[in-house]
Swiss-Prot record:
This is Acyl carrier protein. GO terms for cellular component: cytosol; membrane. Carrier of the growing fatty acid chain in fatty acid biosynthesis. The gene is acpP. SUPFAM superfamilies: ACP-like. Residues 2-77 form the Carrier domain. Keywords: Cytoplasm, Fatty acid biosynthesis, Fatty acid metabolism, Lipid biosynthesis, Lipid metabolism, Phosphopantetheine, Phosphoprotein.
Amino acid sequence: MADFEARVKEIIVEQLGVDPAEVVTGASFVNDLGADSLDTVELVMAFEEKFGIEIPDEEAEKIQTVGSAIDYVKTHVRK
């Protein structure tokens, strides 16, 4: 399968309109990348659509950094 990290970062850049250099593993969507609550919901929806997964609300709330998004996708996408 394609490199999940690169694909997740690409989605974040597209959704948030941020510089790719800012999208590092430890970056917080809200604190570092300037996302608001609507942006984070849209990010989760984009991950669901692009990777064909369903992210329950309680899990979505835990996805707050680039790294946590990558880890979630890697764990839940069928190989």
